[in-house]
Amino acid sequence: AIRSERTPWYFGPTVLEQMDAFVPVPSPENRPLRMPVQGVYKFTEGGDERRIVAGTLEAGSLRAGDKIVFYPSGKKTTVASLEVFSAPTPEKFIAGDAAGFTMTEQIFVRRGEIACLESEEAPFVGVRLRANVFWLGKEPLRPGKRYFFKCGTAKVEARLESILRVVDASELDSLERSEVQKNEVAEVILRLDRPTAFDTADSGCDG
């Protein structure tokens, strides 16, 4: 690529140089396993004591024999079998599949936890997080007020700790505001009532 003489003020990369620097985004199947737990179901008819963990794979893949960790609890187990309803059992589940599996150890897990492979990158677990939000509520978003924070299948009460900045959507300028009005974008700090597992937007782990 040849730099134009008409833009002597520009010292950044050319379009071709920038395109060559792009890194392909892994397909959801090739990212670390993320399966938010939708529910745990127990079947007792005919002496069937299996507990089936159900959910949808947001990313990654899952096979019988895989060692998994549930976050935020940190509980570990091994996948004993894959389970599907009224269909042949697949060799593996991949991102996008509605999945069910049984465990070798009957540990207690609940809706909202995230199943991950022990050998792969773990999600973040925390009670305080920085987030960019697009506010759609009728009432302004105000510090000190309590809200529900939803991530995957988890639903946790949270308090808005502070507003770092409000962004003017038309000019992209930062505004100093004490509250966030409807249809405004803001960067805020949230404090959750209990530890919750999540991935950051730039981690490459989300589905």
Where would I find each of the regions flagged by the language model?
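Canonical P-loop GTPase G-domain recognition
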Residues: 1-41
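C-terminal effector/interaction modules appended to NTPase cores
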Residues: 44-207
